[in-house]
């Protein structure tokens, strides 16, 4: 039996292509949704851009038929605009002057009319609660939602390696079938590896020493940059060795790196350190510059209305980047700065020369950036559509680094399963162009107090 989905405005704003995601079912767009889209189409940023995309998609439908009667979609479904049910009664506490409540009126009207399987689709949790109170089935938009299996993928695994092939591994690597895992009962079994997955190998006759490798074309090969010290920084744990390998590898082999983890696991710090190494100390000129973006939930949509230049507008967001730069520059024992003023002058020089540039996320959209080391910090506050726009715009020689913690979401309508960082990790898993790693809680490099607080609070 076909279902009838009533679509809220926020679904189309987050995913303007959402009409394509409901198979052969019926879709209803309340008239108030059109009004809201019309009010948003001139807004700066992704909200306005997505509103315009959604409107254009509806216009294409209008050109094919009558939207009041219903227009067939390519997937076999039917979309229509609903202008009726203005007289449907709601509880006194739900005024019909509010857009959300007018959407509820459409849902209730369709249900009272006898249409079966009426489902409201909205990103708004409160609206879903109100719908349930009124006996209306409501769901989140799940087309971009990742599964438990996707969420649990960390980009790293452990395996045992026979002692007699350890030397072979160190020299040229071993095939994946040569290593194995062991369950709690001591039964050995093969492992299903993912391309570019990092591997901690334990020789089966000596569990004290471990070897670090990466899956490449059916083999597990040793890390190439294990002994590197980008801008004088040395790895302090296994996760940082894996981060270093992914970041130091050139954009021709690793154009996309995804690093997830708690605050304090050196995601941003290490990404900046490698970027500085590549731009300052690489004579081949691998990258022209470092660009850092840091999306913010309350900021991106309103940047056009804030006073000042672009850099003045985004300066508050970039303070954590400055903090990491100070730590990186002052960590070099051969170039230790005498005082804070000298260190600040050096950082100012780096920005003035354009070696590091900071950009608002909206200013990246639509550009094709070449030979750039592009860091997207706090990427969990991006939508899947935003991440797609960034990755698919990567120019030749550009390396994109997505950093963040899926459990620290600040943006409305996103959660740990629907944010852009998790979505990119799911979609790019297994791609030879994507390297990803999730840092462990014990790999947090903040103070002992901070580490203890993470465990206790």
Predicted regions and their residues:
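Conserved coupling/interface region of RecA-like P-loop/ASCE motor cores
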Residues: 39-69, 423-457
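Structural recognition of the conserved hydrophobic beta-strand(s) that form the central parallel beta-sheet
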Residues: 6, 291-293, 357-358, 375, ...
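Hydrophobic anchor at the beta1->P-loop junction of P-loop NTPases
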Residues: 259-261
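Conserved glycine(s) of the Walker
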Residues: 266-267
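Conserved RecA-like ASCE ATPase "motif II neighborhood" in helicase/translocase motors
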Residues: 14-16, 352-389
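Conserved P-loop
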Residues: 270-345, 411-432
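N-terminal pre-P-loop "Q-motif" helix
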Residues: 232-255
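Active-site-proximal, substrate-binding regions of enzyme catalytic domains
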Residues: 3-119, 125-230
């Amino acid at each position: 039996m076909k279902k009838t989905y009533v679509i809220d405005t926020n679904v189309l704003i987050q995913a303007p292509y959402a009409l394509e995601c409901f198979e052969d079912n019926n879709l209803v767009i309340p008239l108030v949704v059109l009004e809201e889209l019309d009010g948003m189409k001139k807004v700066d940023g992704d909200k306005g851009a997505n509103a315009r995309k959604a409107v254009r998609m509806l216009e294409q439908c209008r050109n094919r038929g009558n939207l009041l009667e219903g227009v067939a979609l390519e997937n076999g479904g039917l979309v229509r605009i609903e202008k009726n049910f203005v007289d449907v009664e709601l509880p006194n506490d739900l005024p019909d002057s509010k857009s959300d409540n007018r959407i509820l009126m459409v849902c209730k009207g369709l249900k009272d009319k006898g249409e079966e399987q009426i489902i409201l689709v909205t990103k708004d949790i409160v609206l879903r609660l109100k719908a349930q109170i009124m006996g209306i089935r409501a769901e989140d938009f799940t087309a971009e939602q990742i599964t438990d299996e996707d969420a649990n993928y960390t980009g790293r695994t452990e395996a045992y390696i026979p002692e007699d092939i350890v030397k072979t591994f160190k020299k040229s690597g071993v095939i994946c079938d040569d290593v194995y895992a062991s369950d709690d009962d001591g039964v050995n079994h093969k492992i299903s590896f993912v391309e570019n997955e990092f591997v901690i190998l334990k020789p089966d006759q000596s569990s004290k020493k471990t070897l670090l490798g990466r899956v490449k074309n059916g083999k597990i090969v040793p890390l190439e940059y294990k002994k590197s010290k980008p801008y004088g920084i040395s790895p302090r744990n296994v996760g940082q060795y894996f981060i270093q390998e992914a970041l130091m590898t050139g954009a021709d082999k690793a154009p996309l790196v995804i690093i997830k983890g708690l605050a304090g696991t050196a995601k941003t710090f290490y990404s900046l350190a490698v970027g500085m190494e590549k731009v300052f100390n690489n004579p081949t000129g691998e990258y022209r510059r470092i660009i850092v973006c840091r999306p913010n939930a309350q900021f991106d949509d309103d940047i056009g209305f804030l006073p000042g230049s672009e850099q003045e507008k985004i300066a508050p967001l970039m303070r954590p980047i400055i903090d990491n730069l100070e730590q990186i520059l002052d960590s070099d024992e051969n170039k230790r700065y005498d005082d804070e003023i000298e260190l600040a002058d050096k950082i100012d020089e780096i920005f003035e020369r354009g070696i590091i540039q900071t950009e608002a996320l909206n200013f990246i959209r639509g550009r094709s950036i070449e030979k750039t080391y592009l860091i997207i910090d706090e990427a969990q506050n991006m939508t899947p559509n935003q991440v797609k726009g960034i990755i698919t715009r990567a120019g030749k020689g550009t390396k994109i680094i997505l950093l963040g913690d899926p459990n620290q979401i600040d943006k409305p309508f996103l959660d740990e399963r629907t944010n852009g960082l998790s979505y990119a990790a799911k979609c790019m898993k297994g791609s030879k162009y994507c390297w990803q790693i999730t840092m462990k809680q014990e790999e947090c490099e903040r103070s002992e107090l901070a580490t203890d607080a993470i465990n206790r609070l």
